[in-house]
Amino acid sequence: MLSPVLQELITLFESNQHLILNPPIYYLSALKGILDSLHLAGLYQEMPFFIDRLRKMQQGDYATEFLLEINASIYQYEQVSYINTGKFEIALELSGNYEDHLFKKIGLLRLETQLKLYLNTAILYLCLEEPIGGFRIRC
């Protein structure tokens, strides 16, 4: 499996904390790259380890916008995992859990992140067969 090599990469980052910038943009970028790769490969069972690393980053004393980006990333990767494994009800519940601390602050996020959040939401509702604009799609 690919995951042990990726876990070793993250361990390397974590063992060299003195080299990580504040905020740790390269570390965040590495985690997101790994999660993107796991998503594309359909290795959803490998994602929780790396999502937990994102959660640990939330404990840092960083700018509000940076922490919000981390929060959005956690949501996106959890959400895509649930949607792509057919766990639509759990994905819908997750959306509700993030309403106050993510979606109500969506204007503070980068445009690219906002678009990803809206796209994931649209895909979820299409998979739930909720009509959006009169269209229905089966997932």
Regions found by a protein language model. Give the residues of each.
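"A position-specific structural signal for the A-helix of alpha-solenoid helical repeats
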Residues: 26-36, 70-80, 84, 113, ...
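Alpha-solenoid helical-repeat scaffolds
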Residues: 1-29, 33-50
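TPR-repeat structural position
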Residues: 2, 44, 88, 131-132
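Amphipathic alpha-helical segments of tetratricopeptide repeats
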Residues: 6-19, 51-63, 92-107, 138-139
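Residues that mark the junctions of alpha-helical repeat units in TPR/alpha-solenoid scaffolds
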Residues: 2, 20-23, 27, 64-67, ...
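C-terminal structural cap/anchor segments
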Residues: 129-139
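Large, well-folded core regions of big proteins
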Residues: 38-39, 43, 47-50, 54-60, ...
